[in-house]
Amino acid sequence: MTTSKCPVTHLTMNNGAPVADNQNSLTAGTRGPLLTQDLWLNEKLADFVREVIPERRMHAKGSGAFGTFTVTRDITKYTRAKIFSEVGKKTEMFGRLATVAGERGADAYTRVRGFALKFYTEEGNWDVVGNNTPVFYPDLRKFPDLNKAVKRSAHQYSSATNNWDFWALLPEALHQVTIVMSDRGIPASYRHMHGFGSHTYSLWNEAGERFWVKFHFRSQQGIKNLTNEEAAKIIADDRESHQRDLYEAIERGEFPKWTMYIQVMPEADAAKVPYHPFDLTKVWPKKDYPLIEVAEFELNRNPENFFADVEQSAFAPSNLVPGIGASPDKMLQARLFNYADAQRYRLGVNFRQIPVNRPRCPVHSNQRDGQGRATELRQPAHYEPNSFGQWSQQPDFAEPPLKINGDAAHWDYRQDDDDYFSQPRALFNLMNDAQKQALFDNTAAAMGDAPDFIKYRHIRNCYRCDPAYGEGGSKALGLTVEEPQAARATDPALGQGGLL
């Protein structure tokens, strides 16, 4: 019987020198102490303790794959972006789907999922950094507080008290809370969930006309979700359930696909609609701004190296291309800086030179040097203006002017539009009886051992949304329906600026 042999790969140090012995450390005699001149041992240990890079503050654990984006409908009347220049056009992309608050724990544990896409367009990388929910919170000033509330406390364990204390003090969170506590709260896999850009972005066309836009990505596999009990069983057996499902589906040739839709609002409509169109706690009614199918994408190639491509992938809403822009959405405005800056901390200032993040088009930035620099600047002049015609700006790609007004101040966004209950009420009333009961039961399970005054505070928000929401939640939590208003007298939050 003959045995096929793989080609021998000789072990070397990082400088290319051969490793003579990878079994025994260099010592003074058989039983003597180690010698500091054991170069391979020194290098091996030094590299080992630096293998782990800083964890993402959110979306720490995820899966990723490369894929193909294909345009299915002409939207050039809305945008000049070349990725949408013609029907049938294909663009290479990378997607990372992730848990949000669960650190690097089990995939089936936390509820919200991250949905980040990177498109390698001929005009630069375009990133859509969203979630599997269409809404979030209105101001990034509270994002660090959210992070601390939903993750480990100072005592090193997650706390239902911290989580729900924070949520219940922010009535604007009820829309998101209603979604994540619903029967769609825990996706069965990354393949079986929708994705949303969530924010309001802008498009502009060759004529300089601006439109406001929301991006939607609907799973062609359909929606599948887990109950709390089903998720608990999966967690006990397989902490990588979502990662395994996505990877193995692609390996089998069952490429997951999503259809991309947009909602388009003419620029002037933003001042006319009866809600704040840039408020991330709100959705746009589809009867007013229907979904328009634009494209589809599939994830069809697994990374060869998980760390190189998935862990080092870096997404930022500031990665925009001509024809696609931002909006006055406060959360988006702050993320334009914060996300890229988080990648500089996590991966270094030259994170865009890592292959998975590198644009496929030529890059002619005169930013130079810094830790991890891997490309050369061959031009003699690294400054602008200069006498050699280098680094010339491109005014033809300027975004149309945006009219703004108002005095600079710490404006209370609640004074602009404090209706945080109409939309969760509409969502609640779309649910059938079984879905409403799942919402009540999931909320009760998630609130756990949180103090009663926090539970009552949340129930008051539910009552303000819909009496049936409050009554069902009260019953699931074992609270007396008549008590929520009376409990205000013992709620310590009443002294915190009238938040309730």
Swiss-Prot record:
Top-level enzyme category: oxidoreductase
Give the required cofactors.
Answer: heme
The processes (GO biological process) annotated in the record are: hydrogen peroxide catabolic process; response to hydrogen peroxide
Entry keywords, A to Z: Heme, Hydrogen peroxide, Iron, Metal-binding, Oxidoreductase, Peroxidase
Annotated CDD domains: catalase_clade_3
Pfam families for the chain: Catalase (PF00199), Catalase-rel (PF06628)
Q: Where does heme bind?
A: Y339
The source's superkingdom equals Bacteria
Q: What is its EC number?
A: 1.11.1.6
The reactions it catalyses are: 2 H2O2 = O2 + 2 H2O
Q: Where are the active-site residues found?
A: H59, N131
GO cellular component terms attached to this protein's record: cytoplasm
Gene3D superfamilies for the chain: Catalase core domain
Name any one GO molecular function: metal ion binding
UniProt record similarity statement:
Belongs to the catalase family.
The function of this protein is:
Decomposes hydrogen peroxide into water and oxygen; serves to protect cells from the toxic effects of hydrogen peroxide.
Protein name (record): Catalase
Name its species.
Answer: Neisseria gonorrhoeae
